[in-house]
Amino acid sequence: SFNTDAMAMLKSKIAQERTFELDVTNGLINKQRFDPRRVDVSAKVGTVERWIINSSLPVGFTIQGAKFVIESQDDVNVDASELAWKDTVWVKKKVQILVKFEQPSSNTHPFLFGSSNLMLADMGSLGIMIVQ
């Protein structure tokens, strides 16, 4: 066994809840293709958010500049022994994660989130996130 503070995330105050719909066939997130001029998520440093990620097909999902624990996969709570910090998760159908924002970013140096599959990322399955 190893020591981690990941378990404490389950008791965190949730600043916001967001839902993301991944259309794997068309490379879209929430029916939108990546636009480098559009900020998709604005979050605050030091907060925790619940992200619910639904996918049309199994796909990897990653977040830059933040870490998270998986709360549930396909509506089944994750066992306490599986709680660990992650930056990428495999989404079969639905994943619920608790995202902790500790690193700031800006309009000139934003973070990206979205598909960890590079072909899907090239199709536009990415979003821009600013953390301040």
PLM region spans:
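Edge beta-strand plus adjacent loop/short-helix module at the start
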Residues: 1-104, 117
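Short, surface-exposed ligand- or partner-binding patches at beta-edge/loop junctions that are enriched
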Residues: 106-119
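Extracellular and select intracellular beta-sandwich modules with Ser/Thr-enriched
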Residues: 123-126
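Interdomain boundary/hinge segments at the C-termini of tandem beta-sandwich modules
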Residues: 129-131
